Amino acid sequence: MMAMFEEVEVEAYVYPTEDINKVKKAMLNLVPGLKFEAFDKGEYMILVGKTRDKRALQRLYELFRGQQILDTARMMLEEGYFGEEIIIKVHKQVAYAGKVNFNEESPLGPITITIRTKEPQKLMKWLAPRTKDGVPIE
């Protein structure tokens, strides 16, 4: 896959009741190869992972197809598209189990994925093409 993005940033809040390594695993289940930094905010920590690895979005590509959620994924990408950024939020516990769920309503907050790209349309078409009867048509 050619590089259609400059950087992928993944962010989540980590609360005192949570294991930071489990939150890291949840984030890595979606975007492998992240380099992490943690910021202590007192009541919680903010965990930020970044990567410029050109294969960073391959896992999401596979999950969207494996879970047959291309239409939902496309809708979420389009909703989260602002200029040269695409932002999606996914459920943290579901990510820990190695799946994607766009229901971000979780007491522990979502995982936020920000894709920085100069070619957002091209990237969306690759990551989650439009479908007809579940089959990609782009």
UniProtKB/Swiss-Prot annotation:
InterPro entries hit by this protein: PAB1135-like, Ribosomal_uL5_dom_sf
One Pfam family here: RNA_binding
Gene3D superfamilies, sorted: 3.30.1440.10
Similarity remark: Belongs to the UPF0201 family.
Name of protein: UPF0201 protein PYRAB09730
Provenance organism: Pyrococcus abyssi (strain GE5 / Orsay)
